[in-house]
């Protein structure tokens, strides 16, 4: 079906720059308004894969904003989703560029409601002490791409939740969400005001082993570690690494063996390598027999 046919059957609505429904999208130009969105309970996603994941969660998506050339694609994504009544607003490319402050090459945005704080879901995953479980704790990960990559890793390795220190970047910021391919919507997360102290309390309450990634001389090679069934993997920002307080909370510090002259990896790569070792056997056992 062509674009005009979609318009005639009411699949989308053309809008002008002054339409009040476009106002939240304008926040992409202003970092203060982006932070306001975090506090007020909304976020903005971009590109088809993220929109598909947003629309898979009924009630999450408030509206879709598409360029004229992407309107048919937006209609297709919505039709195949769990939320087929979400309005699609179609604007000229120049209008969208004036709203968001940059050329949106893929022509698709969506406004969504933030999921509730993930603390309750994380606590529920930890409740049964006989169950194998892993969490990922992030200390001061301020890089937009890295926070998205860490959530993609968390989803890939069956992590039950992500714990964030106060300085971590918002995982639902549009670029972080895009890097995570929308998985930041699926993996529950919570911010901890005192990461080290709160993790100590969680260890006692839920029987968790706290493993911190580090390049310290005393850190054990991850391959030599028998994976604990219940664990938290702590990662820090790439150059400073974990703080002394976070390291002191850990039961073990672990490292990834590397060639001489290379002392560190991207935090997302390092987390993936560690989680593959810590979770690989469990995930393999869960695969259906072939």
What are these regions (language model features)?
Residues 11-18, 87-92, 187-198:
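Short acidic-hydrophobic, aromatic-tinged amphipathic segments that line or gate anion-handling sites
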Residues 49, 83, 111, 116-218:
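RNA substrate-binding interface of SAM-dependent RNA methyltransferases
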Residues 1-76, 168-169:
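Boundary-proximal intrinsically disordered activation/regulatory segments immediately upstream
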Residues 211-262:
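Active-site/ligand-binding-proximal alpha/beta "capping" segment
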Residues 108-110, 153-157, 171-184, 244-290:
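Structured adenosyl-cofactor binding patch, chiefly the S-adenosyl-L-methionine
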Residues 14, 43, 139-140, 165-166, ...:
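Glycine- and other small-residue-rich loops at beta-strand/loop junctions that grip anionic moieties
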Residues 80-106:
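Glycine/small-residue-rich loop that forms an oxyanion/phosphate-binding "nest" at active or ligand-binding sites
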